[in-house]
């Protein structure tokens, strides 16, 4: 079976690097947002949602083509934007940085690669953080690589002016490890579905709060313009990367509002969401009944998850092209 990026065979844009996607910064997406030709009602809802989707953290591993190994070393050693942390004959580590933060991390370890039968070169970056100089370096490096594998890709939905502190985030089907962090007044700040080292982990967190507490000055300024800014993020590793456009179908995401249900139903749903130890003692048929109710019961006029799926469908071709570029599918075209 071919992987996701191997199914993409055409590229709409050309550059000096060969074939590349159009890089778009998250801030540009928000400020210069253009609506697709959709119906008035759906368009109004989309405008109210102010939602954007983008690729976030990316990790690729690869082999360096032998004929380009010296060229890559020269690039890393001589480019003024690159800081060399470590350099030996068979190993180096280097990075670009902006405001004291690593933007593009480059690691090469030939001996370790041979010892573990693994690709020896590794690149880590966040597409939303790349500056023009980083994009230029990235494009040059990708052209030097072969047998590229995307070992991590994050898909991020930014939800502007939507308070998700009382939203439900659950996985359909079999449960997974869950962790929550709440404020002093018991409002949700962060929720994790799945273990941090698993192939899939889903995060919902208060992005505005995170940016204001640990962002750069420009990031804090950007975040300050919003009353609410939340992010729903899907972190995928290894084989799960191929599920990047379908993993959203595995979750339940909606406001926590069951006031119109019977008291009995509300109690069962509350136990499922907030008292896992008690919930495990409930008969499996009852658990199945209320898990289905949680999934299908409409808790608000807007189906937020459906709107996010529609947005992903609209942006899928662009995101596929971007992923394929990182995987080196367009080099030399």
Explain the meaning of each model-derived region.
Residues 287-292:
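Helix-turn-helix DNA-binding segment
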Residues 2-282, 297-333:
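Structured, helix-rich domain cores that form ligand/interaction pockets
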């Amino acid at each position: 079976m071919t992987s996701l990026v191997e199914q993409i065979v055409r590229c709409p844009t050309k550059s000096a690097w060969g074939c590349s996607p159009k890089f778009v910064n998250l801030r540009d997406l928000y400020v210069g947002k253009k609506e697709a030709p959709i119906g008035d009602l759906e368009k109004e809802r989309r405008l109210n949602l102010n939602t954007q989707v983008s690729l976030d953290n990316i990790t690729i591993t690869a082999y360096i083509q032998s004929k380009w190994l010296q060229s890559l070393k020269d690039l890393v050693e001589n480019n003024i934007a690159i800081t060399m942390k470590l350099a030996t004959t068979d190993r180096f580590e280097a990075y670009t940085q902006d405001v004291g933060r690593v933007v593009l991390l480059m690691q090469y370890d030939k001996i370790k690669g041979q010892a573990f039968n693994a690709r020896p070169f590794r690149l880590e970056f966040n597409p939303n953080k790349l500056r023009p100089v980083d994009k230029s370096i990235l494009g040059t490096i990708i052209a030097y690589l072969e047998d590229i594998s995307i070992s991590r890709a994050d898909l991020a939905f930014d939800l502007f002016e939507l308070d998700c502190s009382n939203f439900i985030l659950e996985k359909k089907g079999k449960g997974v490890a869950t962790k929550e962090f709440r404020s002093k007044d018991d409002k949700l700040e962060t929720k994790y579905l799945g273990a941090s080292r698993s192939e899939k982990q889903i995060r919902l967190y208060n992005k505005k709060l995170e940016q204001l507490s640990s962002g750069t000055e420009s990031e804090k300024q950007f975040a300050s313009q919003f009353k609410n800014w939340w992010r729903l993020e899907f972190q995928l590793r290894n084989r799960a990367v191929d599920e990047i456009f379908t993993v959203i179908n595995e979750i339940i995401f909606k406001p926590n509002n069951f006031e119109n249900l019977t008291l009995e139903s509300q109690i069962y749903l509350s136990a499922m969401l907030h008292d896992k130890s008690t919930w495990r003692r409930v008969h499996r048929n009852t658990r199945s009944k209320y898990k289905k109710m949680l999934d299908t019961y409409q808790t608000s006029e807007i189906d937020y998850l459906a709107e996010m799926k529609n947005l992903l469908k609209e942006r899928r071709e662009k995101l596929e092209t971007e992923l394929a570029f990182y995987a080196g599918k367009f080099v030399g075209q």
